[in-house]
């Protein structure tokens, strides 16, 4: 982390709080507020390479006392090959439409986000976001973002994934979907389709965190 040491950045630790992903676990984070600077993209890119993720206008990494289940990962897009389970997932969901959305956040996506959070993460801060906070989360001020949506055969939105764009790749920030589609592995489908899309674009890496 030599790059980070040279920036005179201020890192802070949170107190422990209930984990949104693993039941009966406590989470703690090391985080940094992103300063207003023309060098933000380089800073955010370096933080991402070191395992940090964005949330609103800060970057964080889990530093939990008794758990290390959240593992930062960097997927080499060029070397990525579909596994048997990946192929099964694509076959199960071959009726779905995956496409890039270039517009602003719409009401349909926000309502889907609320439905997902209320079902999966009802006790988390994200479950209580209003629409302005949601848009601030999706469209931050210090780097570009892309949103990919998934639609069913009736053209109803059933899932979305938010990805930040960095110098050497993309970072999967957050994904959500209709809870009733969980058995079809829509969360996994969003990642697989994102990887295949980035492969077409010759994007080097996809950063994410495995839970």
Question: Which ranges hold each PLM region?
Answer:
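Metal-dependent nuclease catalytic cores in nucleic-acid-processing enzymes
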Residues: 188-204
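A conserved beta-strand-loop-helix scaffold within acyl/acetyltransferase catalytic domains
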Residues: 53-67, 73-183, 192, 197
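Terminal substrate-recognition subdomain of acyl/acetyltransferases
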Residues: 1-104, 200, 204-211
């Amino acid at each position: 982390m030599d790059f980070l040491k040279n920036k005179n950045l201020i890192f802070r630790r949170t107190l422990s709080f209930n984990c949104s992903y693993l039941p009966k676990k406590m989470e703690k984070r090391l985080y940094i507020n992103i300063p207003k600077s023309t060098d933000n993209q380089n800073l955010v890119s370096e933080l991402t390479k070191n395992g940090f993720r964005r949330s609103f206008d800060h970057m964080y990494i889990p530093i939990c006392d008794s758990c290390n289940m959240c593992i930062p990962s960097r997927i080499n897009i060029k070397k990525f090959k579909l596994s048997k389970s990946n192929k099964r997932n694509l076959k199960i969901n071959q009726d779905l439409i995956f496409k890039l959305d270039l517009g602003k956040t719409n009401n349909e996506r926000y309502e889907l986000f609320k439905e997902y959070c209320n079902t999966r993460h009802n006790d988390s801060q994200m479950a209580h976001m209003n629409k302005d906070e949601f848009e601030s989360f999706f469209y931050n001020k210090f780097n570009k973002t892309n949103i990919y949506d998934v639609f069913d055969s009736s053209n109803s939105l059933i899932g979305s994934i938010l990805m930040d764009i960095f110098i050497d790749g993309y970072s999967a920030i957050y994904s959500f979907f209709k809870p009733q589609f969980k058995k079809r592995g829509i969360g996994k489908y969003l990642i697989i389709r994102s990887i295949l899309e980035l492969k077409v674009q010759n994007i080097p890496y996809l950063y994410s965190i495995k839970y």
